[in-house]
Amino acid sequence: MFTAFLIKYAEIGVKGKNRYLFEDALVKQIKYALKKCDGEYAVRKTDGRIYVDAVSEFDYDETVAALQKVFGISGICPVVYVEDEGFEKLGERVVRYIDEVYPDKNKTFKVAARRARKNYPLNSMEINVEMGGVILDAYPQMHVDVHKPDILLNIEVRDKIYIYSEIIPGPGGMPVGTGGKAMLLLSGGIDSPVAGWMIAKRGVKIDAVYFHAPPYTSERAKQKVVDLARKVAAYTGPIYLHIINFTDIQLYIYDKCPHDELTIIMRRYMMRIAEQIARQTDCIGLVTGESIGQVASQTMQSLVATNEVCELPVYRPLIAFDKMDIVDISEKIDTYETSILPYEDCCTIFVAKHPVTKPNVNIIRRHEQNLSEKIDEMVQTALDTDELVIVQA
């Protein structure tokens, strides 16, 4: 029975004079998401509301699922609407709505009207009273409960009169692209895809970089990362994934540096490379999946040592999350099962038995000097052989 949806948003509604920019961005993201659905849709913005109208045959569940992946949407309301043909016609449509949507009439209800069009002959309270009376006349077994009703029937008087009672949760956040652009360090683990999803939820467009170490990491490990990027891209739109061959750099560091510092020094070079790619692609920050104390390279001292090599800000959305909190989100966004596939990435291959947990930055710098100019040549080679994959859901 539903052929239209009212799109609710939260934070966008409190924006000031630039609110229209966020609304326009949300409309753009909705149109992009619906391209993957069977059917044709008209997306329109009017009177501070966004509406999606199906203009052909469409799959209801598929459409809702697509809209639930659009950041900026807080709620999706399947609506029916009537032209303003008089109060009697509205009452007939409300009764038919109750009949079609709620087969069990042994329920409580409340009518919540909102009159945005001020020339409508009844005010909001009068609409509530009149429509409540119409429903009770049609279904005497129903009862009014203004505090905790089973059915909250919304009636909005705008260009048309919209009727809805269900609000399907959206992902919230802000439309992708309204918060700048950042480079995600994406591995095959649980954390980094979640970090990318979370920063994108705040409106940040993400590209990604993955450090590959053949033959120590397999093609299946690389494909796993591409698959994870595709899962995240279902929410963010296309992700430009940069695949960097890190093998020679890792082996050289392994040969020249103390093994208890391997992880930190390798991590510092990953950050250096990621920052260079970020600058080349107009990203204004880096994003990682680090969480304080989760592993040796994620103590506060280790994060200080990692940050030191970056001029761009490093965003860590998961910094205070427990592991199970991260797992819960990964299951929600459908990355968990892919993340736990048993294909190792370069961070798990070259791991010291007893990694330093409180690295001294001065000592780390001194050991990096032992790498001479050769490491700079390796870094440049890695950048020159960057494999770019455009990942789409």
Residues covered by each model-derived region:
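Active-site adenylate/phosphate-handling loop in enzymes that bind or generate adenylated species
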Residues: 133-135, 172-179, 250-251, 255-333, ...
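Structural beta-sheet core signal
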Residues: 184, 208-210, 243, 288, ...
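Conserved G/P- and acidic residue-centered "switch" motifs that form tight phosphate/ATP-binding loops
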Residues: 189
